[in-house]
Curated annotation (Swiss-Prot):
One of its GO terms (biological process) is SOS response. One of its GO terms (molecular function) is ATP hydrolysis activity. HAMAP family: RecA. Belongs to the RecA family. The lineage of its organism: Bacteria, Pseudomonadati, Pseudomonadota, Gammaproteobacteria, Pseudomonadales. It comes from Pseudomonas syringae pv. syringae (strain B728a). Can catalyze the hydrolysis of ATP in the presence of single-stranded DNA, the ATP-dependent uptake of single-stranded DNA by duplex DNA, and the ATP-dependent hybridization of homologous single-stranded DNAs. It interacts with LexA causing its activation and leading to its autocatalytic cleavage. One of its GO terms (cellular component) is cytosol. This is Protein RecA. InterPro entries: AAA+_ATPase (IPR003593), DNA_recomb/repair_RecA (IPR013765), DNA_recomb/repair_RecA_CS (IPR020584), P-loop_NTPase (IPR027417), RecA-like_C (IPR049261), RecA-like_N (IPR049428), RecA_ATP-bd (IPR020588), RecA_C_sf (IPR023400).
Amino acid sequence: MDDNKKKALAAALGQIERQFGKGAVMRMGDHDRQAIPAISTGSLGLDIALGIGGLPKGRIVEIYGPESSGKTTLTLSVIAQAQKMGATCAFVDAEHALDPEYAGKLGVNVDDLLVSQPDTGEQALEITDMLVRSNAIDVIVVDSVAALVPKAEIEGEMGDMHVGLQARLMSQALRKITGNIKNANCLVIFINQIRMKIGVMFGSPETTTGGNALKFYASVRLDIRRTGAVKEGDEVVGSETRVKVVKNKVAPPFRQAEFQILYGKGIYLNGEIVDLAVLHGFVEKSGAWYSYQGSKIGQGKANSAKFLADNPEICKALEKQIRDKLLTPGVDTKAVGSREAVAADDMSEADVDI
């Protein structure tokens, strides 16, 4: 850059700092690059598929899927993991359906969890914004976007038409709170439901509620589905779950993770650790027997997972080995989940910002 341009730039930067404050414009090279802080999801496979070890702080995340697919369970698992790190969490229960007893079984400290059950969508989003601006909250879950009913719709008659009200509400709210979320380094998770578009001939007819604003403002979008049942004999004790990372602005997108959710217990982490440890050679499998460092730890996956539950030090050591190997920059995370075909709508929004 020639001297005249340097002088002009210095004058402009000086004027900007005087008018808007120091740090309004910064040179990227003047500061060390720092890894984006993340909060674990409670699923080792999903943490690895996300590329940074969990959900990013200071960002908006959308989790959507069909009914009974595990959306609320996954968010409660995130809250439980955050609380273990000493974080303060809030749950905005717009659906008025949070079960404290179930949350406690998943490891959530319900005594310290802040809960709000707002009457209208405007109230829910205003409460969310105020909690973010307090700079004292680390994780906020909004359950769900579909239940954020505008005040005009609640006060109107049952058959009244309110076209686009919820979409406008979400768009306005997200414009307002996005900057605050970054400044507060707070993770905000929106749970969303699926609807069907009428008359779609080609492509997926599925869409999410609340308009398109959330799709663009979200740094991470997770599509969670129930793929099967977990049985003990004839009794169904849980569900097989698949999560696709359909948008990721902090790591490569389109990874997927598969894990089990056990009823009344949550994500089956020890089972995941056994599977991944075998896949990457940390645990040896011979027939039905599993061995770790030359010693047998159990016959069958269930017994091996029970051994890890009874020996938390070995469990933590195995988990650390897996994380160190798969979350090292440059390591291909396809070992956990492959790239999956996603809807064209998701492809168009999946910006990558590494």
